Amino acid sequence: MATKKSGGSSSNGRDSRGRRLGVKKFGSEKVIPGNIIIRQRGTKYHPGRNVGIGKDHTIFSKVSGVVYFRKGALNKTFVDVLEVNSAS
């Protein structure tokens, strides 16, 4: 009798989910303290005025204001939060 053992299932065919990185608040958007502005791996964007950086390089707002992106020395991109006057 000619028989053939059935093939086993492949050990491939899986992948991990995306990490949801990127810019969360774009330029001219309003933020409050603690808002995450960018989630990133490494410092593609650097912290500027009124923002902090977490241990996983997440950039977050320290004050209420408006997000502003600018180019600095050596073509680095900095993220600032510019405080808006509450008098208006």
Curated annotation (Swiss-Prot):
Gene Ontology terms, MF aspect: structural constituent of ribosome
Please tell me the species this chain comes from: Ehrlichia ruminantium (strain Gardel)
Region spans: Disordered: 1-24
The chain's disulfide connectivity reads none
> Does this UniProt record's set of keywords contain Magnesium?
no
Please state what the protein is called. Answer: Large ribosomal subunit protein bL27
Asked if Ribonucleoprotein is a keyword of the record, the answer is yes
The family database entries (SUPFAM superfamilies) matched by this protein are listed as: Ribosomal L27 protein-like
Gene Ontology terms, cellular component aspect? ribonucleoprotein complex; ribosome
Family according to the record? Belongs to the bacterial ribosomal protein bL27 family.
Extract the HAMAP family matched here.
Ribosomal_bL27
Query: Which keywords label this protein?
Result: Ribonucleoprotein, Ribosomal protein
Q: Which GO terms describe its biological process?
A: translation
Q: Where is the composition biased (Low complexity)?
A: 1-13
A Pfam family this chain is assigned to: Ribosomal_L27
